Amino acid sequence: MGVVLISTIFFSTFGIENWKILARIWAVIPVLNGIVFLTSPIYSLHEEGEKGLSIRELCSMKIFWVVMLMMTCAGASEQAVSQWASTFAEEGLKVSKTVGDLAGPMAFAVLMGLARLLYGKYGEKIDLKRFMTYSSILCVISYLCIAFVPVPMLSLVGCAVCGFSVGIMWPGTFSIASASIRGGGTAMFALLALAGDLGCSGGPTLAGFVSSSVGNNLRMGILAAIVFPVLLLIGIQICKKSQKN
């Protein structure tokens, strides 16, 4: 949310033609993070003497591939809408890019943060898999709202609601993986992060590709990406059955 707000203020003040300057400013953050990490203690995920699962051992487990799929779909479900929210707001509401950025990505980010805040505060009282199931269903509904509701303002509300629905997907999948695969360790979390990043790039790419193939109809692009929350929902149900067995 801060990135969207600060970037919008910067472009409004100095003009979008100075985007390279803003890129350099934002580049300072990962540089500082790298310096901090150099001096930060990193503790092992295993008890002393324990050995985590190897990548080969992880790849031999069916549940690992299920959570990998879930992680990919979590990233794709989130970014398929958030990356196109500004364009959707501009085209649907016929507003400037400044207003589009505030109405689209910022509303999405606020509600996504709210979902994570609520779970962080009340997580001990909430069943994670049930919360993720309802969130996935809400995500599907928001996608359908974006694709089919003819009123631009309501479709934009669907974008914001989508932000709330995807808030738990990424951290929730990490938690499910940790509980389902004992001894997964660093290798597991690294591969899950890779899967999530692939989803973050694949979701918007699919939406954009489908949109351009049907006459730049962004609604149809978003509709095509509905496959991701549906697959995530299926993955959650598989994890539930696996836990019972």
Residue ranges and their predicted role:
Residues G34-P41, L223-N245:
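Multi-pass alpha-helical transporter architecture, strongest
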Residues R130-C145:
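Structural signature of the two symmetry-related core transmembrane helices
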Residues L5-I16, A89-E90, Y122-G123, S178, ...:
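Interfacial helix-cap and linker-helix signal at transmembrane-aqueous boundaries
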Residues I181-N216:
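A late C-terminal transmembrane helix in Major Facilitator Superfamily
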Residues M1-I42:
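Helix-loop-helix hairpin linking two adjacent transmembrane segments in secondary transporters
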